Amino acid sequence: LVAALAGMVYSLLLAFASINLKADQTIGGTALNLLATAIAVVIAKYFSESGSAKLNYANRPFLFSIGGLELSIFVPLGIILLIISYVVLYKTRFGLRLRACGEHPQAADSVGINVYKMRYAGVVISGALGAIGGMAYIVPPVQTWNFEVGVAGAGFLAMAVMIFGQWKPFNIFGAAMFFAVFKSLANIADSTFLAQLHWSSNIYNMMPFVASMIILAFTSKNSMAPKAEGIPYDKGSR
């Protein structure tokens, strides 16, 4: 909950820059991404007894067992959020209005939809979900996390997953599972037949990013992105 709230508050900076100031979303997002790492390091050092950017977890939180199989609570949570996202986007008035503001904002405005409010809502919700995803990435696998290391480009990989999934919830889920297979190879390489290859774990860590570049090179031309994606809305333009 705290992570989601923090993500919502931080996403307001991007919303203000891109919606009110009409700044380039890519530049603004990259700047905030770099700033977030620095803020995380400062906060971690403030709360750390050793003064380092590492935080230790006494227990491995957010884990539960089913028949001896240890799972993260974020697994069922992710499935629930996937279903909720689909229902909200395609079966509710709010979702239809939100999609309209991404496809044809001028047309949405002409029927009385406040495009600015809807885009703010979209950014804030995305900030909350992104923060939950970041927490899922750093908490369950380890007992110590170094904030100076960061998440090794996982956020940019998530953007590739979104593009590969054509901005549709269930397609994105399938794309995420595809890239997760490559991501998991680095974790199991030493304990499976892959160990006989004697490859560095860095090679397996590279695979999701290499795969994303190859796939996007062939699929980006058929992208079904919202028509107004990345375009600042000007109420005076028609």
Model-identified regions with their sequence ranges:
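Alpha-helical transmembrane segments within multi-pass membrane transporters and channels
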Residues: 1-37, 80
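Hydrophobic alpha-helical membrane-insertion segments
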Residues: 29-45, 162-172
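Helix-loop-helix "hairpin" substructures at the membrane interface of multi-pass membrane proteins
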Residues: 69-145, 169, 174
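Transmembrane alpha-helical segments in multi-pass inner-membrane proteins
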Residues: 3, 140, 145-209
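Hydrophobic core segments of alpha-helical transmembrane domains in multi-pass membrane transport
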Residues: 37-41, 75-87, 126-134, 158-164, ...
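Cytosolic-side transmembrane-helix boundaries in multi-pass membrane proteins
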Residues: 85, 103-117, 190-238
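Membrane-interface helix caps of multi-pass small-molecule transporters
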Residues: 9-12, 16-21, 42-46, 87-91, ...
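Transmembrane helix-bundle core of multi-pass membrane transporters
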Residues: 36-91, 195-203, 230-238
